[in-house]
Amino acid sequence: MKITQFGTQPYDRESFDRIRDTYGFDICYHRSHLNANNVALAQGSDAVCIFVNDTADAGTIRQLAGMGVKLIALRCAGFNNVDLNAAARYGIPVVRVPAYSPHAVAEHAVALMLALNRKIHRAYWRTRDGNFSLHGLMGFDMYGKTAGIVGTGRIARELIRILKGFGMEVVANDLFPDPQYAAEAGIAYVPLDELYARADIVSLHCPLTDRTRYMIGDAAISRMKPGVILINTGRGQLIHTEALIDGLKEKKIGAAGLDVYEEEAGYFYEDTSDRIMDDDVLARLLSFNNVIVTSHQGFFTREAVDNIARTTMQNIKDFSECRRLENEVRAEPENAVGQL
């Protein structure tokens, strides 16, 4: 079975090459991201393997189907970059890696919280320049504070477990609340308005759907507690970035930790240090000393990268052997908020 992999980074190739002989697949790697202009690279392939910044829209899928591609294998959990309705029309199953490492992303979210709260990033640069002043570096005790978690899927539940260890109170919101989980974890499901009003830290862990796109905008920010720390390790378009910038300028948002950005394609996963940044919104965001942006690296641990490769290859093997596709995703009228 021939597989064309798009958006390949060196670590992808290493992890897939370690196990490719076990599965016996022929893999062709490309650094470029899949889109309608380079889809011809998949000519002669049985499957394409894509990541978060590849584009499998209706036009691209139509071309893939015309080439005889039979499977789209995502090596990530999210699937908002795939037109599932188009895939269904052309009879191309879509599989994903639903839980490669919820620990990795949850731990990264906590790292962002701690760094922003205790100003670790600012202290690092100060001491390197010989400035050992504590002025402007005061944080707050996490103990006794309230965390608001939007979405209570695998990653969020791991995060909640960690935050409870700090002695934090946790309130959550999910389209489909789980009362049994809430009782076991010692959390409370509350309406979003109440979550925004109570939380000292708000962390987003929901997929991108029509319901959640730009859920954090001017209206939501206006209802948040002054000085709130906002964390997003989910999807970039959950936050309207210009509204976030306004909230930061008005000091309504105390700090923001972002592992995703709504227009991250073309920047994230690439070294752009030798060229002028033409995204004025991202440039403005990076100018704040109370904002930390990481390049969608929340998943990036040895364990997670290995799990991604193994699960992706097993998904493809199941398809090639006509087995039930346990990790298939299909078009639905509305996807649940708590999937991540």
Question: What residue spans do the PLM features occupy?
Answer:
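Structural alpha-helical scaffold elements that stabilize or flank donor/cofactor-binding regions
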Residues: 40-41, 194-195, 220, 284-285
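Rossmann-like dinucleotide-binding domain for NAD(H)/NADP(H)
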Residues: 227, 236-340
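Phosphate-binding beta-alpha-beta segment of Rossmann-like dinucleotide-binding domains, i.e.
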Residues: 90-92, 98-146, 158-161, 165
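Rossmann-like dinucleotide/phosphate-binding beta-alpha-beta segment
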Residues: 135-226
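A short helix->loop->beta-strand "cap" motif at the edges of active sites that frequently abuts
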Residues: 66-71, 90-92, 168, 226-228, ...
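Glycine-rich nucleotide-phosphate-binding loops and adjacent flexible coil segments
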Residues: 231
